[in-house]
């Protein structure tokens, strides 16, 4: 989940999930916010609520996470036709007929990874690469000087990171090691466009390019595929370093055309939309989906908190 700069008419959310039939719209029921145009306040409120719930859950006994031995499969080569499911909270529904599952690096149980592996699914592991989250097990490794402004001014639990910091980068290397050990096929590093926000550090487009390329290089060095999360202003510059993209709300904010730099190279673009109209109005959703398919996007309409309360697929 990424919170875009106030100066831009765009919001995203990554910390904020039956089978798909080709060219059909599928749903699994449930409800979400009644807000049609998903505002920055709506996105931030959902993100904060999910983060606070994760924070409370982390106070209890923490299960030991074991390394998951991958099955003897060929390495994942992302394809533009790959379909996906994205669920970062709640009990993970492993029953979708998709190519890729995008789940939380820290919170997803071993049993879920094992089930997905047994089904031949590809696993992308989500973590925030641009913010400190005070419920994560490695949180205390961040220095005070690494942490900047709050992502949500009303909540202390998550702060922007100084991505120039050697300490921050070492922590991210360790997270990539964890992803490798857990048997993830790829990673989704979130909050990688801090320079468009107010992080509390003099981060620039250049420092962001450097950090994002660092993440991609380190992921690939471990045999992991790596996805570019949002950062729509740097798509062309970063495409060569990344294997796929994850986007929020590019259909709502007319930002999808830039992803042709990925799809033209056969790289998948996994897109999530949160607009109430596309949840509730099948005709409006069909129109949006037709445009998304024409651009070779793999689009889902999902709840803000990514808990699988409902799911509509454009594939």
Language-model regions, residue ranges each:
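Conserved, well-structured beta-alpha core segment at the onset of a catalytic domain
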Residues: 2, 35, 96
């Amino acid at each position: 989940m990424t919170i875009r700069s106030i100066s831009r008419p765009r919001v995203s959310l990554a910390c904020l999930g039956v089978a798909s039939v080709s060219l059909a719209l599928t749903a699994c029921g449930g409800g979400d916010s009644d807000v049609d145009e998903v505002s920055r306040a709506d996105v931030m409120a959902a993100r904060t609520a999910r983060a606070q719930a994760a924070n409370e859950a982390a106070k209890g006994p923490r299960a030991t996470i074991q390394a998951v031995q991958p099955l003897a499969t060929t390495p994942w080569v992302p394809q533009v036709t790959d379909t996906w499911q994205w669920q970062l909270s709640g009990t993970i529904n492993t029953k979708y007929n998709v190519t890729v599952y995008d789940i939380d690096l820290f919170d997803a149980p071993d049993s879920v990874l094992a089930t997905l592996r047994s089904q031949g699914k590809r696993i992308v592991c989500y973590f925030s690469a641009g913010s400190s989250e005070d419920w994560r097990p490695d949180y205390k490794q961040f220095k005070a000087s690494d942490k900047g402004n709050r992502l949500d001014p009303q909540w202390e639990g998550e702060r922007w990171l100084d991505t120039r910091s050697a300490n921050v980068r070492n922590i991210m290397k360790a997270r990539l090691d964890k992803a490798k050990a857990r048997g993830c096929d790829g990673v989704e590093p979130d909050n990688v466009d801090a320079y468009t926000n107010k992080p509390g550090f003099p981060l620039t487009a250049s420092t962001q390019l450097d950090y994002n390329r660092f993440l991609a290089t380190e992921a690939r060095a471990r045999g992991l595929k790596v996805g570019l999360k949002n950062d729509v202003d740097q798509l062309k510059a970063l495409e060569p370093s990344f294997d796929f993209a994850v986007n929020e709300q590019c259909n709502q904010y007319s930002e999808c055309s830039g992803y042709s730099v990925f799809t033209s190279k056969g790289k998948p673009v996994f897109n999530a939309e949160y607009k109430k109209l596309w949840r509730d109005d099948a005709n409006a959703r069909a129109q949006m989906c037709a445009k998304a398919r024409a651009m070779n996007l793999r689009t889902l309409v999902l709840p803000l908190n990514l808990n699988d309360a409902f799911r509509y697929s454009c594939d």
